[in-house]
């Protein structure tokens, strides 16, 4: 399933135009531009811990 991975506080994980960073916890991921900045978008989002 695709989506924005979140941290332990429920905040989207931000990135700085670095797809490798986004892919470390997902099947594949990339930096995606949002109104407020950049966040990781992932295919294969891991379940929340």
Swiss-Prot record:
<keyword id="KW-0964">Secreted</keyword>
<dbReference type="GO" id="GO:0006952">
    <property type="term" value="P:defense response"/>
</dbReference>
<dbReference type="InterPro" id="IPR044062">
    <property type="entry name" value="LCN-type_CS_alpha_beta_dom"/>
</dbReference>
<dbReference type="GO" id="GO:0090729">
    <property type="term" value="F:toxin activity"/>
</dbReference>
<keyword id="KW-0800">Toxin</keyword>
<protein>
    <recommendedName>
        <fullName>Beta-toxin Rc1</fullName>
    </recommendedName>
</protein>
<feature type="disulfide bond">
    <location>
        <begin position="15"/>
        <end position="31"/>
    </location>
</feature>
<feature type="disulfide bond">
    <location>
        <begin position="26"/>
        <end position="42"/>
    </location>
</feature>
<keyword id="KW-0872">Ion channel impairing toxin</keyword>
<dbReference type="GO" id="GO:0005615">
    <property type="term" value="C:extracellular space"/>
</dbReference>
<dbReference type="GO" id="GO:0019871">
    <property type="term" value="F:sodium channel inhibitor activity"/>
</dbReference>
<keyword id="KW-1015">Disulfide bond</keyword>
<dbReference type="Pfam" id="PF00537">
    <property type="entry name" value="Toxin_3"/>
</dbReference>
<dbReference type="InterPro" id="IPR018218">
    <property type="entry name" value="Scorpion_toxinL"/>
</dbReference>
<feature type="disulfide bond">
    <location>
        <begin position="22"/>
        <end position="40"/>
    </location>
</feature>
<keyword id="KW-0528">Neurotoxin</keyword>
<keyword id="KW-0738">Voltage-gated sodium channel impairing toxin</keyword>
<dbReference type="InterPro" id="IPR036574">
    <property type="entry name" value="Scorpion_toxin-like_sf"/>
</dbReference>
<dbReference type="InterPro" id="IPR002061">
    <property type="entry name" value="Scorpion_toxinL/defensin"/>
</dbReference>
<dbReference type="GO" id="GO:0044493">
    <property type="term" value="P:envenomation resulting in negative regulation of voltage-gated sodium channel activity in another organism"/>
</dbReference>
<comment type="similarity">
    <text>Belongs to the long (4 C-C) scorpion toxin superfamily. Sodium channel inhibitor family. Beta subfamily.</text>
</comment>
<comment type="function">
    <text>Beta toxins bind voltage-independently at site-4 of sodium channels (Nav) and shift the voltage of activation toward more negative potentials thereby affecting sodium channel activation and promoting spontaneous and repetitive firing. This toxin acts on X.laevis Nav1.6/SCN8A and insect BgNav1 channels, and also displays a small but significant effect on X.laevis Nav1.4/SCN4A channels. In mice induces nociception (licking and lifting behaviors) during the first 15 minutes after injection, and increases the release of TNF-alpha in J774.1 cells.</text>
</comment>
<dbReference type="InterPro" id="IPR003614">
    <property type="entry name" value="Scorpion_toxin-like"/>
</dbReference>
